[in-house]
């Protein structure tokens, strides 16, 4: 299978590894990017593999409470300048109002606002996309927005200040699950197998590797779960420990960040300026 430049670029963006290393890894896996990442982690060639899902688009995250739930909406545009534009934000808030009224699906939101969107694109001169909407249920909800780029809503049993602080923690620390035991078994097994292989590649006997992996797996599930993470307000304690001290709990959370997973075209600024200068001379 011929390896394309696009595949090499994607792997390079996701791992931070060199171009030739990426091409070699893809060749060895017959173009399987996920397997290539695993193999590069084993060999130590992809120390930045966690870069997957970096922000690659502009726009805004908005939040509004409904009856017993909250709606989180992402609307995208092409530049940070337009993301702050009053017309763009008014459009995004109009979509949010409808979403928060009755948990409207993203497909229905897109259809309902398509004409308005097209008119705004013509007016502003940038592509605009109503990308996604998420809903979280709960009688006790707290929200936090970091500017308009990150939005978090946390559901749980706690006082307002505690839940707000937890929402701020989620914004900063990006947990994927509420508790370590919520991490899916297949993800745990995949990581465990990977860690055993890494340990054995370091020259450790199988029985020693197994024991080492127990600690590594506890760290792995803790780092990607909210209650297992070190609390940003009190780094010596986990979020779970702090919640327990307060007699509080978190049942769910949603975190959205502008542009997650969107491939953004890389601009050559120098070439762009040169082209503009050439155009003025023409």
From Swiss-Prot:
Cross-referenced InterPro entries: EF-Ts_dimer_sf, Transl_elong_EFTs/EF1B, Transl_elong_EFTs/EF1B_dimer, Transl_elong_Ts_CS, UBA-like_sf
Annotated region described as Involved in Mg(2+) ion dislocation from EF-Tu, given as residue ranges: 79-82
GO molecular function: translation elongation factor activity
CC per GO annotation: cytoplasm
Matching Gene3D superfamilies: 1.10.286.20, DNA helicase RuvA subunit, C-terminal domain (1.10.8.10), Elongation factor Ts, dimerisation domain (3.30.479.20)
Keywords: Cytoplasm, Elongation factor, Protein biosynthesis
One Pfam assignment: EF_TS
SUPFAM superfamilies found in the cross-reference section: Elongation factor Ts (EF-Ts), dimerisation domain, UBA-like
Main localization, broad class: cytoplasm
Cellular localization per UniProt: Cytoplasm
Role noted for this protein: Associates with the EF-Tu.GDP complex and induces the exchange of GDP to GTP. It remains bound to the aminoacyl-tRNA.EF-Tu.GTP complex up to the GTP hydrolysis stage on the ribosome.
Family: Belongs to the EF-Ts family.
HAMAP family named among the record's database cross-references: EF_Ts
Protein name: Elongation factor Ts
UniProt lineage: Bacteria, Pseudomonadati, Pseudomonadota, Gammaproteobacteria, Alteromonadales
Record gene name: tsf
